[in-house]
């Protein structure tokens, strides 16, 4: 579990997150929503210590986040950023990087490392890309490889910043299904998404940010009922009940 208590953060002395308090629970998918530049990605990077925190505290399973070394942190939290470099290596070699927190130096991969990589690539629908060079892959294929690398870290918390970027509709839905399955395994899954309807459909909890401030945090139904989505996005959001639950759309 990751708990943020009255967290503030700043870039170059300019405060960008203001008094945020929310919790990412194990066994749940939490989606961060908000307009561009509202602080969603910054929130994830603040949890990881990449952005200076100027106030408040962040707890990982009840312990201050600053008590964790980078190596120990990488065994607890996996992070899929918006973009990554594209080295000239195979997809499987890239996914093996997810095992670095468990290796000494020089790095010698064990059977369990190779097994974790194989399982992660299968989960991310990237197994058929194993021997392909990353520069030769499409953006969507590379995204699946990067997702597999995050899964290969075998962490209990997974932070993903726009994981559906570059993916076609089928693979977007597969990523959301994977997020649900990971939560079902007891992991805390946190996603930054721009697809409002997909987020409301798949999330257990939704956090809405605007100008670095938390506007709402709760179930999709509670957030919808609050009217905050209309105010923040300046749209009209509708919902209809189907056999599979609520479906949302907007105009």
Model regions: which residues?
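Catalytic Walker B motif of ABC-type/P-loop ATPase nucleotide-binding domains
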Residues: 158-162
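ABC ATPase nucleotide-binding domains
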Residues: 230-251
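Conserved structural motif at the start of ABC-family nucleotide-binding domains
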Residues: 2, 17-19
């Amino acid at each position: 579990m990751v708990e943020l208590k009255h967290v503030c953060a700043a870039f170059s002395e300019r405060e960008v997150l203001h008094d945020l308090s929310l919790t990412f629970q194990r066994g749940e998918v939490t989606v961060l929503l908000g307009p561009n530049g509202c602080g969603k990605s910054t929130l994830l990077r603040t949890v990881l210590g990449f952005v200076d925190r100027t106030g408040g505290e962040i707890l990982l399973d009840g312990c201050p986040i600053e008590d964790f070394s980078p190596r120990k942190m990488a065994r607890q939290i996996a992070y899929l950023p918006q973009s990554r470099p594209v080295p000239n290596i195979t997809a499987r070699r890239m996914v093996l990087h997810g095992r670095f927190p468990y290796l000494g130096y020089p790095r010698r991969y064990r059977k369990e490392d190779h097994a974790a990589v194989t399982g992660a690539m299968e989960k991310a629908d990237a197994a058929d890309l194993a021997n392909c060079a990353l520069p030769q892959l499409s953006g969507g294929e590379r995204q699946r490889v990067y997702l597999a690398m995050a899964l290969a870290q075998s962490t209990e918390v997974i932070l993903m910043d726009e994981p559906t970027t570059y993916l076609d509709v089928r693979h977007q839905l597969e990523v959301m299904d994977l997020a649900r399955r990971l939560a079902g395994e007891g992991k805390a899954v946190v996603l930054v998404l721009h697809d409002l309807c997909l987020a409301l459909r798949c999330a257990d909890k939704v956090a809405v940010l605007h100008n670095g401030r938390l506007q709402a945090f709760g179930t999709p139904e509670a957030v919808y009922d609050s009217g905050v989505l209309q105010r923040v996005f300046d749209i009209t959001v509708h919902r209809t009940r189907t056999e599979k639950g609520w479906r949302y759309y907007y105009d």
